Amino acid sequence: MAIGSVVLTPGTVYTVPGALDLSGASPPDSEWTARVALAITAASGEFAAPLLLVLTGAAAAHAPHLGFAQRSARRAVGGYVLVDPVLPRPGAVSDWPDAPVTVVITSDADDDIRSAALGARLRGWEVLEGDPSSLIAGIAARP
């Protein structure tokens, strides 16, 4: 599925041309999913679906819930990119992932994150290493 728009969620520090950039927000963890989903809804005239949701670090654990919120709003998710992630707990949302998941490991990743990449591979997710900005742009450009 071709990607319509990239959404950079709070905590991301990457530059992707044409992305919906919500990275400047810093909602508390207990309100993270709701606030980000509302911000995406508020900006819905600025982007096209399906979305490529980019989550970084501990925020990556919110991916299943943010994806569910987008489906509830009738917005298609074309993929997830988790950068140096804390991986989501299996079964947090029963039908997640509903789109391809790519894990990006940066040069700043610590040993715990690198070992978590093994868990991502075991789940059948693509794992890439390198510069997140260029990798995200490349993923978004896939047909």
Language-model features: locations:
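Short hydrophobic segments within beta-strands
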Residues: 7-10, 54, 83, 104-106
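Active-site catalytic motif of lipid deacylating hydrolases and related acyltransferases
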Residues: 2-49, 125-130
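Flexible, charged surface loops at secondary-structure boundaries
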Residues: 1-2, 44-48, 74-75, 95-98
